[in-house]
A protein has these predicted regions:
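Metal-cofactor-dependent catalytic cores
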Residues: 1-144
Length: 144
């Protein structure tokens, strides 16, 4: 199964919007070069499906974490519902490993309190860089 990387963002400062990139270098066991989250943890990169992003944009009441979740990679065409921890992805010349699926909802979120199933909770994926490489907008992303 294959999808496409539709957007790349680097976040250099807390609370600031991300910088849209045409390409980025991903460093093995670190994350995206220059990103404030590139610290070698289990959440080196964040991925968001286009479906989840589209759903977020049409909500009358934004979820509590809509502004908090910062996606490094936005994709189309790859069913994120098929992703599980341990699954490997090829993105550009980099290899990624899924470390966590399904972001946990925060207490106090209007969507959660109103019983609305948030697509960010299932469409937000955390990744680790397994092999360094370059990714570009328009590159394919596929499950290995």
């Amino acid at each position: 199964m294959e999808g496409t990387i539709t957007a790349l963002y680097r976040f250099t400062e807390k609370g600031k919007p991300g910088e849209a990139l045409k390409e980025a270098y991903l460093i093995k066991n670190v994350g995206m070069e220059g990103d404030r989250h590139a610290d070698g943890g289990e959440k080196q990169l964040t991925l968001l499906s286009g479906e989840a992003r589209g759903w977020m944009q049409v909500q009358e009441t934004p979820g509590l974490c809509f502004k908090r979740y910062k996606a490094n990679l936005e994709i189309e065409g790859l069913a994120v519902s098929n992703l599980r921890p341990g699954i490997c992805l090829q993105a550009g010349t980099a290899r990624l490993t899924v470390t966590e699926c399904a972001k946990e909802c925060f207490q106090g979120c209007q969507l959660r309190e109103n019983g609305i199933a948030c697509r960010l909770s299932s469409g937000g994926i955390y990744l680790k860089v397994a092999e360094s490489g370059t990714v570009k907008t328009g590159d394919p992303i596929l499950i290995l």
